[in-house]
Amino acid sequence: MTLSQEKINNMAACLPVVGLLLLVAALPFHYGCAQRFALYWLAVTYPLDYVLNHRWSHWHWTPAKWIYVAFIAFFCLVPVWQLFDPIRTPLFDFTIEQYAPFLAVGLCGIAGITDKFQIDYAAWTMLGVSTAIVICLIVRTGLHHPDFAHWVLCFNINRAEHINTHMVVNLYFNLSLILGIFVVLYEKRSVIVRIITALYMVPSIFALLITEGRTGLLTFLLCTFVFLLHYMLVRRRWWMLSVVAAFVVLAGGIIMNNERLELIGKTTNPRIYIWKVAVETIMEKPVLGYGVCSAREEFVRRGLADKEFNEHYADYVRTFPKYTAQGRVHFEIMHPHNALLETWMQFGVFGVFLLVICLILPSLMRLGKYQLFLDLCILAFVMQACFESLGNNLQPMYLCLMVLLFQNQYQSDVYLQKLKRQASEHPVAEITPTA
């Protein structure tokens, strides 16, 4: 291979990395041109890299790739069930687009991606975007407020208006912190880089502590507790028992003094009535489900006939300008606020089985030092899935991308170790120069 060919191949290998970083940077914002551009970029550069660098030459099947088969199978439920769905609404096209990561990442995961991508690239990108979001919100909110509580309220309102819902942004913050911890503890970087990475984590922690989203805050506390507990037990750092105990006390104080969490015992969560209607809908067709479009139609029909559902959910939709246009109320935006229930409504027990497989298999991949952090990412996603539906404020790309990045990083490490071992066992013979 000539020097120019090598440069071209290296450039081709780096182009998908640019697309992945653009995609990672665009995730906390509303789905639009930024994410689409990143996906189009990957659609062009991924096959270019795959062909020029002969990625197939090192391909081999591993048990870890079964997760990508599950991703593809889960995506295929959408078009297959539509064949038997008597109606088709714009929700079908929306669902296809939102579930596309299961198909795209599934295919890329099986085939393999560029070895140029590193977890710390994603970590720094996510932490940088998170820091920029928090700084922009602080500037927009200003400092002239009567008290801190009012400032926090304005901060969260600005985030909802200019960035995205608390469910989307808080999950992004939590995942960025998980990747940041990995870089600080395990990446072979200088002390300065680790300190800077740790400092970049502070804005995300601050935003999670003042968020109005209970799920985001509880996810942050739970993931931190699991990490500390795992580090203490697996690494046998028994001195950390005092750290874990102190964190439990601190977390308890945060929970007890959070206004939104205090409301749990005083008010009824609207999701209780939403889930009740969802379960009633499921019980009509528990085995096969309705399909994407019919499931939503039946859910909305039953909900509008339910007094408590109307009082705690539908009335909010009726009065919110975002959901009223062209002289009618867009009730079709109402959803079960639970990924498992919505999947069950749509695809029956087949969908539930595949969704559970997609959430369990990543924890069985045996990725060495990467496994704990992938498990924490899955835990954060599952926490969100308990209170949100896939494709609404719970983007499948979060799950698919984390699985792909950690598994690819692990495979790259294994391959490099294999090359080093072969080099040590079979040293290159001295080459006699020729005239």
What is each residue range found by the language model?
Residues 41-46, 355, 374-386, 390-430, ...:
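Transmembrane alpha-helices of multi-pass inner-membrane enzymes
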